[in-house]
Design a protein with these regions (language model features):
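Helix-loop-strand module that forms the ligand-binding subsite of alpha/beta enzymes
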Residues: 1-60
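Glycine-rich phosphate/pyrophosphate-binding loop and the adjoining helix
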Residues: 47-110
């Protein structure tokens, strides 16, 4: 994952703030949060053969689950370097997915 994202995770990974422990183990303290994971990767890691090598989305999802967050959406743009002839379409499709999620978020009232 990018260093700034890892730094952010390091800052919010705080006992008593985002998680705590009880007699049964760790307990997430921010289950009311929503997370959207945006990930672009040049290769394709969603296939059964490559999935074990995917270490960014799975890592971020695991950390968020540790904090108690289960409302997680993903937009993954993958394969644009592996398939340069389809790169523009792959990226355009991913950006449409981002716009769809963003428009849904814009309609959320607090």
């Amino acid at each position: 994952i990018p260093a700034p994202l890892q730094t952010f995770i390091d800052y919010i990974y705080r006992a008593g703030v985002t998680f705590s422990y009880n007699e049964n183990g760790p307990v997430g303290l921010v289950p009311d949060k929503k997370v959207i994971i945006l990930n672009a990767r040049g290769g394709v890691y969603s296939t059964p053969e490559m999935a074990p090598s995917e270490m960014s989305v799975n890592y971020v999802r695991m950390i968020m689950n540790f904090f108690g967050i289960t409302d997680i959406e993903e937009v993954i743009i993958e394969g644009h370097a592996q398939y340069p002839d389809r790169a523009q379409q792959i990226i355009a499709d991913g950006m449409e997915d981002v716009k769809t999620i963003a428009s849904r978020l814009a309609k959320v009232t607090v």
